[in-house]
Amino acid sequence: MRSRRGLLIVLSRPSGVGKGTVRKELFSHEDTRFQYSISVTTRKPREGEVDGVDYFFKEREEFEEMIRNEKLLEWAEFVGNYYGTPIDYVEKTLQEGKDVFLEIEVQGAIQVKKAFPEGVFIFLAPPSLSELKSRIVGRGTETEDVIENRLTVAKEEIEMMDAYDYVVENDQVELACDRIKAIVVGEHCRRERVAKYYKEMTEGL
């Protein structure tokens, strides 16, 4: 039983919680039917990241032109870099009845919720703040100042989890993926998402 319009599934987390890791594992599952909406960013690619797969990497001037032309569903500036979601792909895919999966920063998720309150908003939480710091430091790509800034922002973002519908603890990647899939199955069965279609069906009897 599925509603005709696709679900917008929004996943975000504090820096260092492993959002990209969870997304990659989730999309490696054969039963995953989400359409991944790739974000646009002005930050430099990290080792192993591929343009057009992990992000669309843009120059700052290009991104600002997209803002002016209203080509972004949401955008935010985080640690000196822009991040945003192209709007055309999202709306087209939802209209086709396909689920769209976004992984975006907390600021961006709050913008999206204003435009798509019917979306499913999932906050990926760390097991603890000490574990969060270990993950950020373990990257080996950040200066001490950047690490401290990320931790400060992460604490602020955790305090904003009330804006989300669900909280999934990322203690183990596989378990986090199972929880996310279970949430989506349940959301597709919510009465308010499917009732009108069944009412239309019974009108013809």
UniProtKB/Swiss-Prot annotation:
Coiled coil, from the record: none
EC number(s) per entry: 2.7.4.8
InterPro entries linked to this entry: GK/Ca_channel_bsu, Guanylate_kin-like_dom, Guanylate_kinase, Guanylate_kinase_CS, P-loop_NTPase
Keyword Phosphoprotein: no
Binding residues for ATP: 13-20
Protein's name in the database: Guanylate kinase
Lineage top rank: taxon: Bacteria
Residue ranges annotated for the Guanylate kinase-like domain, each copy included: 6-185
Protein species of origin: Bacillus cereus (strain ATCC 14579 / DSM 31 / CCUG 7414 / JCM 2152 / NBRC 15305 / NCIMB 9373 / NCTC 2599 / NRRL B-3711)
Xref: Pfam families: Guanylate_kin
CDD domains, per database record: GMPK
Recorded family membership: Belongs to the guanylate kinase family.
Role: Essential for recycling GMP and indirectly, cGMP.
Gene Ontology cellular component terms for the protein in this record: cytosol
Compartments in which it is found: Cytoplasm
Record keyword Cytoplasm present: yes
Catalytic activities: GMP + ATP = GDP + ADP
GO molecular function: ATP binding; guanylate kinase activity
Annotated keywords: ATP-binding, Cytoplasm, Kinase, Nucleotide-binding, Transferase
